[in-house]
Amino acid sequence: DGIRDRLVTGVQTCALPIYPHDRISAKHYGVNPTGNGRRDTFRNLPIPRMRATYMEAGNMKEADIISKVKNGIFVDTFTNGQVQIGAGDFTFFVKSGYLIEDGKLTQPIKDINIIGNGPKALADITMVADNDKIDNGTWTCGKDGQSCPVTCGMPSALVSKLTVGGEN
């Protein structure tokens, strides 16, 4: 929407200090636009959208985090994420990963779902690794019938509670 983008710090202590806005939503809420007005073609109106979502690295080694997990999963690649805006409920399809058993990566896994709630999952992060990872830029944000390319990145992190494959 012609507004220069700026850093929008998403989550600090599990609260959004600044929400992504386009010109219209910023005016409605009486705040400054953040440069998040995006559209997939000139035929569509800009709407507030994600651009690049990233989680800062922590100070632990990935191997140290894995070694502290008795039973869990390590997700290497996921896709087809969906989020219910407002409630924050999400689901992601795991393309590849591993079981974690007694602190070690064991059996390969694939074709399972991870289901959770965004704010709760953020609150349940107990460890964050120092290994920055950025995706290859193949994500798409779908909203109001539009699709826009987005990117994301994060280090390895331990989320203590999520639903996996429909079971707790």
Regions found by a protein language model. Name each.
Residues R4-N168:
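N-terminal small-residue-enriched
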